């Protein structure tokens, strides 16, 4: 099926792909995105590796939420889900470029 030269070339391509994927993963680990809820009253900044870097709650919301802890919790959760969704989307776009055209599941081999 593959000659020695063909198999060697294929292995070299696979190694290069793995190196490029590692670089992309490292970049994603530093790429920050922001999710928000309540028209920006709660903002969460996280990396595409899901490391939360910052939570910003509007002082106005803190005053309003003094009597409504559940509302504040819901807004924080919504902002976190928003940030996580954006992080996943960004990561999938970036990593998808490496696995485009490969059979399903083969891309997981390189992660």
Curated annotation (Swiss-Prot):
Subcellular compartments: Cytoplasm, Nucleoid
Q: Transmembrane region positions?
A: none
- Subunit details: Homodimer.
What the entry lists under PANTHER family is as follows: NUCLEOID-ASSOCIATED PROTEIN YBAB
Q: What is the lineage of its organism?
A: Bacteria, Pseudomonadati, Pseudomonadota, Betaproteobacteria, Neisseriales
Q: Which organism is it from?
A: Neisseria meningitidis serogroup B (strain ATCC BAA-335 / MC58)
Q: Which GO terms describe its cellular component?
A: bacterial nucleoid; cytosol
InterPro entries hit by this protein: YbaB-like_sf, YbaB/EbfC
Functional note:
Binds to DNA and alters its conformation. May be involved in regulation of gene expression, nucleoid organization and DNA protection.
- What is the official name of this protein in its record? Nucleoid-associated protein NMB1444
MF terms in GO: DNA binding
Q: Which UniProt keywords apply?
A: Cytoplasm, DNA-binding
Q: What Pfam families does this protein's entry cite?
A: YbaB_DNA_bd
**Record-stated family:** Belongs to the YbaB/EbfC family.
């Amino acid at each position: 099926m593959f000659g020695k030269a063909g198999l060697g070339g294929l292995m070299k391509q696979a190694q290069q792909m793995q190196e490029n994927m590692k670089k992309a993963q490292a970049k994603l680990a530093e790429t920050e995105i922001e999710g928000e809820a309540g028209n920006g009253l709660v903002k969460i900044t996280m990396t595409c590796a899901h490391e939360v870097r910052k939570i910003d709650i509007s002082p106005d919301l803190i005053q309003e939420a003094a009597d409504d802890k559940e509302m504040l919790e819901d807004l924080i959760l919504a902002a976190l889900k928003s940030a996580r969704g954006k992080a996943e989307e960004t990561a999938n776009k970036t990593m998808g470029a490496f696995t485009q055209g490969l059979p399903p599941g083969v891309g997981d081999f390189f992660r």
